[in-house]
Amino acid sequence: MKILVAMSGGVDSTVTAYKLKNLGHEVIGCYMKLHGKPNYHEENIKKVEKVANFLQIPYHILDLQEDFKNKVYMPFVDTYKEGKTPNPCALCNRFIKLGKLLEFAKSLGCEKLATGHYARLENNLIKTAVDESKDQSYFLASADKEALKYLIFPLGEMKKEDVKKFASTIEVLKSFATQKESSEICFVEDTYVQVLDQFMDTKIPGEVLDSSGKVVGKHEGYMHYTIGKRRGFEVRGAHEPHFVLKINPKQNQIIVGTKEELKISEFNLKNINLFIDAKELDCEVKIRYRSKSTPCKVEIYEDKSAKIILKDPVYGLASGQMAVFYDHDKVIASGFIE
């Protein structure tokens, strides 16, 4: 089978390419340039070239910087401007890795696209990985349903520690087993505010309000805060911890309250992405990557919006984040929180 492998220069994509080549497939590597960091790309391309030469496979360098800027980077900036919390990895998977890269794979005549994600596929549905601590099914839930039939996740049945051990047994790949893992958001080196600083003044002080609308303190600029944050702002006369409940970007205000006020029992979604045919769901939902799943009921409307009613309340629901719905270990839907 002819397979394009997304190669980043990391241990996961390296072992992915190795495994598929060893199974006798015709493997082609591809490194994606997503943002303008020449030194970063130069270092990673050297690693990809080293692996490609060792495996005796061809590889391509695909410049997707413009697509990445339009579909991922600027929406990241704009979402924070709106006082919401973006999910750039979900957008990148949908439009870039499982979008533009898949188009490129097809243009080469490849039957499949393989990535080093920790996830599995079964009956055209994404499943959680064997290694729960590294499971990436949440971020892959933004994928177009039609893309799934072309995907392979060779590491889905492996533990991360075993992937590293495997690489360490092969002389040429030993260095990949010990290298530092990439950061969660590839274009954020330290904090997301440093990215926003390139486009706007993030340090404009504003008012802190309580849930009744009373001014109770000051903050250092609304973009420094996300829903649920409890530090970095002043609340005069507070006798218990206060958390960000809401952000009002137009007035440069943040609304704060107690943990009890942060509690949510239902919420709305826009643009629900369904992997099964259904008008309502009885399932579990994750409201962010590292959160535990919560039982819920989902009512789906004609305009692809949805209402989610939770069995147990959750804390810190952030507009702009992705909610992912599971039937046991299978992803059945996703959507962005309004």
Swiss-Prot record:
InterPro entries named among the record's database cross-references: MnmA-like, MnmA-like_C, MnmA-like_central, MnmA-like_central_sf, Rossmann-like_a/b/a_fold
Keywords carried by this UniProt record: ATP-binding, Cytoplasm, Disulfide bond, Nucleotide-binding, RNA-binding, Transferase, tRNA processing, tRNA-binding
Region spans: Interaction with tRNA: 134-136, 288-289
Binding residues annotated for ATP, in chain numbering: 6-13, 32, 116
GO cellular component, one term: cytoplasm
Protein name: tRNA-specific 2-thiouridylase MnmA
Main location: cytoplasm
Active-site residues, record numbering mapped to chain: 92, 186
Cysteine pairs bridged by disulfides in the record: 92-186
Entry keyword Hydrolase: no
Entry annotated with the keyword Transferase: yes
Catalytic activity: S-sulfanyl-L-cysteinyl-[protein] + uridine(34) in tRNA + AH2 + ATP = 2-thiouridine(34) in tRNA + L-cysteinyl-[protein] + A + AMP + diphosphate + H(+)
Task of the protein: Catalyzes the 2-thiolation of uridine at the wobble position (U34) of tRNA, leading to the formation of s(2)U34.
Pfam families: tRNA_Me_trans (PF03054), tRNA_Me_trans_C (PF20258), tRNA_Me_trans_M (PF20259)
GO MF annotation terms: ATP binding; tRNA binding; tRNA-uridine 2-sulfurtransferase activity
UniProt xrefs under NCBIfam families: PRK00143.1, trmU
